[in-house]
Amino acid sequence: YPPKPENPGEDAPPEELARYYTALRHYINLITRQRY
């Protein structure tokens, strides 16, 4: 599996959080696509 994106933390700037959630969604898509 690809490495899980790092959680930037509660006090991260909004663009940092947005990038994290985008990466996380992409990561989940990769994993679910591989599994099924």
Curated annotation (Swiss-Prot):
Where Tyrosine amide occurs, residue numbers? 36
GO CC term, one of those recorded = extracellular space
Please cite one Gene Ontology biological process associated with this protein.
Answer: neuropeptide signaling pathway
Family matches, as PROSITE patterns: PANCREATIC_HORMONE_1, PANCREATIC_HORMONE_2
Localization: Secreted
Q: Which GO terms describe its molecular function?
A: neuropeptide hormone activity; neuropeptide Y receptor binding
Entry keyword set: Amidation, Hormone, Secreted
CDD domains found in the cross-reference section: PAH (cd00126)
Highest taxon listed in the record's lineage: Eukaryota
| Pfam name, any one | Hormone_3
The set of disulfide-linked cysteines is none
PANTHER family reported for this sequence: NEUROPEPTIDE Y/PANCREATIC HORMONE/PEPTIDE YY, PEPTIDE YY-RELATED
The family annotation for this protein states: Belongs to the NPY family.
Question: Which protein is depicted?
Answer: Peptide YY-like
- What species was this sequence derived from? Amia calva
